[in-house]
Design a protein with these regions (language model features):
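A structure-centric signal for secondary-structure junctions around beta-strands
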Residues: 16, 38, 62, 81-83, ...
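Ligand-binding loop in jelly-roll beta-barrel domains
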Residues: 70-93
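Histidine-centered divalent metal-coordination motifs
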Residues: 34-36, 74, 153
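Conserved metal-binding segment of the jelly-roll/cupin
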Residues: 60-73
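Generic protein-terminus/edge-of-domain signal
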Residues: 1-59, 105
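Conserved segment of winged-helix/HTH DNA-binding domains
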Residues: 89-104
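Single conserved hydrophobic/aromatic residue that forms the stacking wall/gate
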Residues: 152-162
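Amphipathic alpha-helical segments enriched in hydrophobic/aromatic residues interleaved with Lys/Arg
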Residues: 100-150
């Protein structure tokens, strides 16, 4: 039996989170089951991904994204070329929004705000790629707007398992 890997997430040097192009962009790629304490967003802009989250399959195409909650076991299969932006953020960013008996969990079902979130992620990545003067401020502005939208429209309060 294969052991499920724990992935340690480190933010970009110039941002309070990690943003990058998915390493399986050339296709023919499998990322085995793993987990981390961070919250992760996979936003597909071209191509498709087969995403497995808690043993449930999600087929992601252009314009789709999925949010992986902290400690959720997931794996990814990218059979063909794709353009997917990945955001990884520390759970600490949401610390003041949960208490000892209530945690934040993000829904996996499609939401009305999906298009707006995809536009924000796209703009964040384009600004980051250009790295013009003040890029970090613009990215952080978009990032915090995205967090707000996610918190208000996509989060579901949950209780810890006793």
């Amino acid at each position: 039996m294969k052991q499920i890997q724990h992935e340690l997430i480190m933010p970009n040097e110039d941002l309070p989170f990690k943003m990058f192009i998915f390493e399986g962009r050339e296709g023919n790629y499998i990322r085995e089951k793993h987990w981390h304490r961070s919250i992760e967003i996979f936003a597909v802009f071209q191509g498709t991904l087969e995403f497995y989250l808690n043993d449930q399959e999600y087929l992601l195409g252009c314009g789709d994204f999925i949010i992986v909650n902290s400690n959720e076991v997931h794996s990814i299969h990218a059979p063909k070329e794709n353009m997917t932006v990945v955001l990884q953020m520390s759970l600490d960013m949401f610390e003041k929004y949960y208490t000892g008996d209530q945690f934040i969990c993000f829904a996996h079902a499609p939401q009305a705000q999906d298009e707006q979130l995809m536009e924000m992620i796209c703009e964040m990545y384009m600004v980051y790629s250009d790295k013009k003067c003040g890029y970090d401020l613009k990215i952080q502005s978009l990032f915090y707007d995205m967090l707000y939208l996610s918190l208000i429209h996509i989060s579901e309060p949950t209780r810890p398992i006793s």
